[in-house]
Amino acid sequence: MTRTNLITGFLGSGKTTSILHLLAHKDPNEKWAVLVNEFGEVGIDGALLADSGALLKEIPGGCMCCVNGLPMQVGLNTLLRQGKPDRLLIEPTGLGHPKQILDLLTAPVYEPWIDLRATLCILDPRLLLDEKSASNENFRDQLAAADIIVANKSDRTTPESEQALQRWWQQNGGDRQLIHSEHGKVDGHLLDLPRRNLAELPASAAHSHQHVVKKGLAALSLPEHQRWRRSLNSGQGYQACGWIFDADTVFDTIGILEWARLAPVERVKGVLRIPEGLVRINRQGDDLHIETQNVAPPDSRIELISSSEADWNALQSALLKLRLATTA
């Protein structure tokens, strides 16, 4: 059986960073797999996890539970039966509702395959002070479904956010665990703790299944001879706009960082080619984290998520102007 953990968390909480940390510190003799779902369609998390050494399946452009769970079932079955991993980490979109996923993982058909362990919810406590986030049904249900709450980004904690966290915990913590971390440094031993929270979760009223699964199990890619493309996705009060550029497109380093910093959106995530190699960009609100490597990525991908109308055409125009002379 494959030890399995659901790693939830709202937009920008640090799920992918936490998973990368767990993968970097796992037993080298074990085979791990990651099933990742993103709200947008360009597959940024897949690009970030590509060098982790884990088996990887992506379900971009929506939610794992659409169409009676078919996209997730296909990805799950592929990883379990072909990959036969020792451990499986499942990362749903930050706008995802955990009930359908947990229902599927505990279905009788998966009893011989899955040993479901603790569900971790990665939380940025500052979101408890943000009315839009704190009132979001999926945000609340992610916290309600967790066995362990990981209060991430301790280095960014304010007295107000810590007080909000303690108030929430007194009202909702129960006998669950509350762990503090920064930069996604989650102790891997937490993954082997058992499920404790068996409370029945409500179905999500906000999550209608009327949207169409357009891309199946493949992240957006470029057709041959096409230099770049854009993709839009929307749902649950948010919009995502992402771009993919071919391997020969190189961006101005300072320009792309300023573009990402100033974009009037809540979330920016990307892996792009620059003259020095590649840059990974991760922005949530005003928090901007960048990381560079002196290797070129196979392509460039960047995605923005906004809770309000954004002028994607204007943002795209500015982005295209940041391309340097290509290497082709």
Swiss-Prot record:
Catalyzed reaction equations: GTP + H2O = GDP + phosphate + H(+)
First-tier enzyme category under EC: hydrolase
Gene3D superfamilies, per the entry: P-loop containing nucleotide triphosphate hydrolases (3.40.50.300)
Any one annotated GO CC term: cytoplasm
Motif CXCC motif boundaries: 63-66
Residue positions binding GTP: G9, F10, L11, G12, S13, G14, K15, T16, T17, D155
Ranges of residues in domain CobW C-terminal: 241-321
Pfam families reported for this sequence: cobW (PF02492), CobW_C (PF07683)
UniProt EC number: 3.6.5.-
Keyword Transport: no
Regulation: GTPase activity is enhanced by Zn(2+) binding.
Record key words, sorted: Chaperone, GTP-binding, Hydrolase, Metal-binding, Nucleotide-binding, Zinc
Disruption phenotype: Deletion of the gene increases the sensitivity of E.coli to the metal chelator EDTA and sensitivity to cadmium.
Subunit structure: Oligomerizes in the presence of Zn(2+).
Record's function text: Zinc chaperone that directly transfers zinc cofactor to target proteins, thereby activating them. Zinc is transferred from the CXCC motif in the GTPase domain to the zinc binding site in target proteins in a process requiring GTP hydrolysis.
Family of the protein in this entry: Belongs to the SIMIBI class G3E GTPase family. ZNG1 subfamily.
Protein name (Swiss-Prot/TrEMBL): Zinc chaperone YeiR
